Amino acid sequence: IELGMGKKFKWLAKIFAFFGVCVGLFGIGTFSQVNGISSAVHGFFDPNDAFTVKILPFLGEYSWSVVIASLILSFCVAAVLIGGVKRIASVSQIIVPFMAVIYFVFAVILICCNITKVPAAFATIVTAAFSPKAITGGAVGSMLIAMQKGVARGIFSNEAGLGSAPIAAAAAQTNSPVRQGLVSMTGTFIDTIIICTLTGLSIVLTGAWQVEGLEGVQVTTYAFQHGLPFPAQFSSFILMLCLVFFAFTTILGWDY
């Protein structure tokens, strides 16, 4: 910001850096990712809170799976971050493609197993978006809620409009800014157009979006359990593994 807009905008660069740290630490960079990992692990190993521990009186009780997962996560993040950008890159370039391919394969299997429902699923998506109920709801004030949810989902999906992409692009070691720009755009395309579309379609195909009482990770878990031709426990394990490693690499990138 300082080099591009001039030294008189140095204050703006400092504000950008401050809020970037806040978002990375208290927002989508760390806290929400840790919560996602804890929810996934808790839902798989101890969904009924059969074993709980009390760390401090004012913190309440937590499932043993959450405590152990948090300790392991802290150790792994520290071990990678101490190695600097090279270790982060070497770990991420192994984990991210591997887990993306696994998630893609299982999501495609789910869709193929329910291929006859795909036309109806797309019809449901379109009709629900443009139904009189949706239009009326928007007219009476639900539009603001829809926009809020949409912006939140968009930021969590690919961080569009957040301003975080330049941070990662600036840290990249490349001789071609054009190539780096293409890499940044490719990441957004893969994340939103491919991964998120597969996830949304899986949720609609299995009817997980209509099940009451499910939130967040639980919705996708239900879709994988009921849509894949594998034992429910195995499907849940695959999803948990993907979520844990995706969130782990996100923490590495933001904390660095």
Language model feature labels by segment:
Residues F9-L25, A69-I72, A134-S157, I194-L198, ...:
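Select transmembrane alpha-helical segments in multipass membrane proteins
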Residues E2-K8, W209-L228, Y256:
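Flexible loop linkers connecting adjacent transmembrane helices
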Residues F16, V34-V41, W64-N114, V118-V126, ...:
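Membrane-interface loop-to-helix entry segments
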Residues L3-N35, S39-V80, F234, L241-T250:
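Helix-loop-helix module between adjacent transmembrane segments
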Residues N35-G36, G163-A172, S202-V204, Q218-Y222, ...:
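Re-entrant/interfacial helical elements at transmembrane boundaries that shape
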Residues A100-Y103, L110, S202-T206, Q233-Y256:
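Hydrophobic alpha-helical segments of multi-pass membrane transport proteins
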Residues F106-T124, I135-G138, A171-T174, T186, ...:
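Extracellular/periplasmic helix-exit of transmembrane alpha-helices
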Residues A78-V80, G154-A160, S164-P177, S184-T188:
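Helix-loop junctions at the membrane interface of multi-pass solute transporters
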